[in-house]
């Protein structure tokens, strides 16, 4: 089936421009300004939604329309690993650069078909939301759902074009240990909070691998208080835990608390704690109903394999779901490329995603 997105040059140029704008979380100003001007230039009724600190979301909401679905992309990226690898680099079909997969490829893939329909005179019952802050607190999406409600959302996170009707849950954990500051030459085994925390981390790792192997855990940060030539007073670690949509996350949290309590009983010198900073439940949507059928039809007509999967990371979809919005993730690129040193996305996939969204929007125009 031929491409529905006629202006492939414009799509590729937009993707290149987005990658070339450095936009780590908290510093999205330049990319917001660029896209605001870009959408205004093409006569879309774009507006800024302030989220605090001079930061903003970009929204296009057709006036006098009952919105059926919102297309969501996040404009921020993680911080750069290497400043020399910031800019866009093209190797035939492969487009490299920070945010190429997560998720500037996805942003381009929803902006171009939306823009194409407007240029053709259509006013679909579809909103466009380009949000800030997804990589950290999700403050852009939190602000979005305070003011707006949509029945459905499509999020262009990297899913290798697999439609994701289900989504993993997520727990962000902090564990801490405290001790007594003393001269380094007087340190005795077992009373250093760093050692105490390492013993707890080993125990938690054993729990995850032996008792809950279905969970995906990551020890993200480990740091102690600055102490110089002395025993540090505190040590902290941050963990990410992802779990399947049906996992008993309440029971998992209790089991983790019990492990810390047991550690205290077995080691009187251990002064530690565990806290759950963020808890997002997973969800499962049935692959039926209007949007599922429309999407299946698009895949059939484009001869694409219909292989739904569960999205295995946390994302703004968790926040949309908690706000009563039904999110489906579908985008170009894969999580295996996201946040990597040589992040990349296939332009062929970006184009394919853009065609899928073009056809999906067209089907909604026909149902008005």
What annotation goes with each model-predicted range?
Residues 47, 70, 127-129, 273:
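A structural signal for isolated positions on well-ordered beta-strands in alpha/beta enzyme cores
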Residues 1-13, 17, 41-43, 75, ...:
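Secretory-pathway/membrane protein signature
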Residues 30, 158, 172-368:
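Metal-dependent amide/peptide-bond hydrolase catalytic core
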Residues 76-91, 165-176, 297:
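Acidic-glycine-rich active-site phosphate/pyrophosphate-binding loop
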Residues 69-71, 129, 152-154, 173, ...:
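Hydrophobic/aromatic beta-strand patches that form the interior of the parallel beta-sheet core
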Residues 104, 108-172:
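Acidic/histidine-rich catalytic neighborhood of metal-dependent amide-processing enzymes
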Residues 1-98, 119-122, 317, 334:
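Acidic/His- and Gly-rich active-site-bordering loop/insert found
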Residues 93-109:
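Glycine/serine-rich anion-binding loops at beta->alpha junctions
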